[in-house]
């Protein structure tokens, strides 16, 4: 969950700074107890632990039309190309983390509410460890899961 929070905040900050491309790569283990995120010299490209959770999250954002694309680079980093309107405003207006490590929120597919007249999406975690959006959950025979975040 911390990985997803880092990814959400990095995307928010990149859109505020109107960056087109983000690069995410794994962090280095400094010692047994400390883990630090390795940043580039200019500190413009945040680096976050790349996991299947990040990959699935980017896949959902791409399928729903919130980003232009994403790919894995040769060094193992994740490259995300953000999408902007012609006026220069980011397509993603708001990203909100719902479930937190200390306070998990679960819901069934019938109880998922439509925020902002259905313009946003809610991202859920299934019992198999996959991420799906609320539209996929209502189309398939999905029982319920943990609500991770909402994207508008």
Curated annotation (Swiss-Prot):
- Which InterPro entries has this protein been placed in? Ribosomal_uS8 (IPR000630), Ribosomal_uS8_sf (IPR035987)
Instruction: Name the major location.
Output: mitochondrion
Entry's localization field: Mitochondrion
List the GO biological process terms: translation
A GO cellular component entry from the record:
ribonucleoprotein complex
Recite the UniProt keywords alphabetically. Mitochondrion, Ribonucleoprotein, Ribosomal protein
All disulfide bonds of the chain are none
GO molecular-function terms, A-Z = structural constituent of ribosome
- What family does this belong to? Belongs to the universal ribosomal protein uS8 family.
Please give the name of this protein: Small ribosomal subunit protein uS8m
The organism named in the record is Marchantia polymorpha
């Amino acid at each position: 969950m911390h990985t997803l929070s880092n990814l959400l905040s990095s995307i928010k900050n990149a859109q505020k700074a109107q960056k087109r491309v983000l690069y995410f790569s794994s962090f280095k283990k400094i010692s047994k107890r400390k883990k630090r995120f390795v940043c580039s010299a200019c500190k413009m490209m945040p680096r976050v632990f790349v996991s299947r959770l990040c990959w699935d999250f980017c896949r959902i954002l791409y399928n729903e039309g919130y980003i232009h694309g994403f790919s894995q680079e040769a060094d193992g980093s994740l490259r995300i190309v953000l999408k902007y309107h012609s006026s220069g405003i980011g397509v993603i207006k708001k990203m909100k983390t719902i479930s937190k490590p200390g306070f998990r929120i679960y819901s069934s597919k019938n109880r998922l509410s439509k925020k902002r007249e259905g313009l946003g999406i809610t991202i859920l975690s299934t019992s198999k460890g996959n991420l799906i959006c609320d539209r996929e959950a209502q189309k398939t025979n999905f029982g319920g899961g943990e609500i991770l975040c909402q994207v508008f």
